[in-house]
Amino acid sequence: MEQDKLIIRGARENNLKNISLDIPRNKLVVMTGLSGSGKTSLAFDTIYAEGQRRYVESLSAYARQFLGGVDKPNVELIEGLSPAISIDQKTTSNNPRSTVGTVTEIYDYLRLLYARTGVPYCPNHNIPITGQTITEMVSTVMSWPEGSRLTIMAPIIRNKKGAYKDTFEKLRRDGYVRVRVDGEVKMLEDEIELDKNRKHDIDVVVDRIILREESRGRLHDSLETALSLANGMAVVMTGDREELFSSNYACRICGFSVPKLEPRLFSFNAPLGACDVCHGLGITEEVDLDSLIPDPSKSIRQGGIRYYKNIVDTENIEWQTFATLCKAYKVDLDKPLKDLTKTQMHAILYGSDRPIAYSITSSGGNKYTRNDYIEGVKSLIERRYVETTSSMSKEWYHTFMFESPCPKCGGRRLNEQALSVRVGDRNIHSFTLMSVVQALDWIDHLELTETQAQIADMVLKEIRSRLQFLKDVGLEYLTLDRLAGTLSGGEAQRIRLATQIGSHLSGVLYVLDEPSIGLHQRDNARLIRTLKNMRDLGNSLIVVEHDEETMMSADWIVDIGPGAGIHGGEVIANGPPEEVIATENSITGQYLSGKQLIPLPAERRKGNSHSVDITGAEEHNLKKINVKFPLGKLVLVTGVSGSGKSTLVNEVFMKAVQQNLGRAKVKPGKFKKIKGLENLDKLVQIDQDPIGRTPRSNPATYTGVFDDIRDVFAATPEAKLRGYDKGRFSFNVKGGRCEACQGDGVKVISMNFLPDVYVPCEVCHGRRYNEETLQCTFKGKNIYDVLEMTVEEALGFFANQPKIRTKLQTLYDVGLGYLKLGQSSTTLSGGEAQRVKLASELQKRPTGKTVYILDEPTTGLHTDDVKRLIAVLQRIVDSGNTVIVIEHNLDVIKCADWIIDLGPEGGDAGGQVIAVGTPEQIAAHPDSWTGQYLKKALDWTRAHTRAEDGGTTCQD
């Protein structure tokens, strides 16, 4: 009998306090609780990790070494576990070859559709391409200049791996003498060794002819032989000219040929179909002249060319070579670059048009003479950028580069042959330019012949269902060519969700991390319906979520708490939603019932009368909109997913401000004009990226409080006696740290096909410092003891140290009292990292001219955490600064001073300003989707506020 519940006993991962619970299987289960309470530790680090570990354990030792091991979570027993799949918030891929189409596998089905039912059209004459007859091929070749030396070849292997020894042997037996392998002609009598792991092109040389009228018959026979050898393909070469003939597909007027239609022809990741200039990326990188020569009014000697700025007039070999080039073209090094002639600038950028004799002296005093072309600075940087293997050098060259659409394919990624094939009225690239909704409509109205319809039936069904799944999870505005790396965490997660639904698996345990993030309230119902459909297929869903609508729609809620960090890790409630609401000590239940809420501010701020006004913004889908950002207010930018919020704030507003403040490399999105930038002197972006990439980074080092703590220890009597300065108390430098583990506290032992093992350092026993350093104490505690304290404990410990206390207080105020000062930054959640950054900003003296930008800051935050976040944002605005937030969370939106609502829909149907004003004004707007849901939120808040305290609404 199948077990109907998931049994967990003795879970102690991270902050979990030996918890035991039963969760029903094949249900939609929501895990909730404060940020840092232990939800993720239970859902991902315990349940999913154990499911993954059991799968990996079932594989052979050989397979395990490629997968990397999975540690056994700290839990006594888990029973009733299904195969587990995790769908988390991580963005899909930053690989420029990864698109929405490839991630969802829709593009794979499209390639199949175009290969089996596509019709090639000549790009020059717009007529369908049909196979050429041998007579037509002969006529084409006979039109070439008489006396041409022809080589007729059969392309038998194209871009395939193998050593092909048997192939060469058969060709020898058949009497052939020569083959062309990877562009090089070889004799078959010689031993030809090929790397079987590399892809090769092999052409058999069928005949060599001098073109005359009397050789027509021989040409006909040779072409016939080549066509039979290479499945209807033949290559005729003369000098630099090489033409591919096909009895399959070629234009009868100009001879434009298309290879046999197969799926890989339509892949921009395969050499057969990819554009040969950009290799399928759609973009090329070249030197940005504005970056290379930022100020043309400067001369070369004044550092006008940034690349040579620091080596002008030195013995550097690069400078000696460049100075020779300048001398050859009579370039005056003291003349402004803008006054040089076109010929001189061309030589500086692209190099000499003739060999130049010159000599250079090495640093060792040796003299070398050369007579060669000298490379220009632009050509030099572009060549080295491609050739260098040093990441540091590549980074340096990259500072001069900018991306532009490929000059050959125009950003379409594919070669002319692949783009010539159409289904209906579109080639495969123009299909990917459509949004999900447009693509669905196009497929529904696609007209095919009876044969084509029969072939395409199954493929179209797969494409249609996958597009429908994307629409169901609220992503109907995405285009299939959208780069996966440009998706938000929520979008990426919902794409993976759509892919999973498309696989129609059952009996699986899905663990999801806040799928509602980045989704407008309007689209929430569709997402919930999707999750229920997955459950109804016979799957178990565990969803880490804070969205109230999702919680109320769940079959079961597990509430972890009561607080965060050391104050959490317990099961507060475990049952249906109504049971959680009735649980007195459940903070989640109190917010669901309305006993606790986020109140409305007592009044909406009037601002400081200044604003930043943008006119004619038209980046991505923005429709030449005019937007006013009032300063000195809490400004919310809202709208359905894909309406253009991130484009307006991050691409246009933020980059325009950064450029005005001197960030040279930043290129703002397109707009006509902007005014009011003089009212801002600083911009701070507070995102959810980690505060550090290494385990050495922690909240104490990031906020700067660790410097002050080290000052305190350096001032202790013992430290003074020993002559220790503050550097002695750093675990990053030699002196005070334990050298056995270099201040890490642990050692990593590689176990080959087993996971790496982390063992405490046997010298310092995990304490990071050497014994002498730890002997210096302050109030009975050494530096390691302080790093092990929580923010809350440290506040009391350093009560008489105002500098330290102030910094710790800001961490406490943003709700991070439970964090250890020395907790590794890599273990912090996105929400925690963001609040550490906020705390760090709160410590700084307000300028009144600073603008803070936050993109969906409520990700990973419980309603109680959101309450704290709003209080912090209000504090920042109270000090005279401006905060601009992109957000869907109604609790944040209702507390705004000013809202800019975009829409009406996502993608092409968005990009317009629907409404601006206070929350009350937006709620009253008939065309605003945000307004409809905001009105309900405002009414609910007011009703519950009156019920609680007799009618007052106050600022938290």
Language model regions located:
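Conserved phosphate-binding elements of NTP-dependent enzyme cores
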Residues: M1-D956
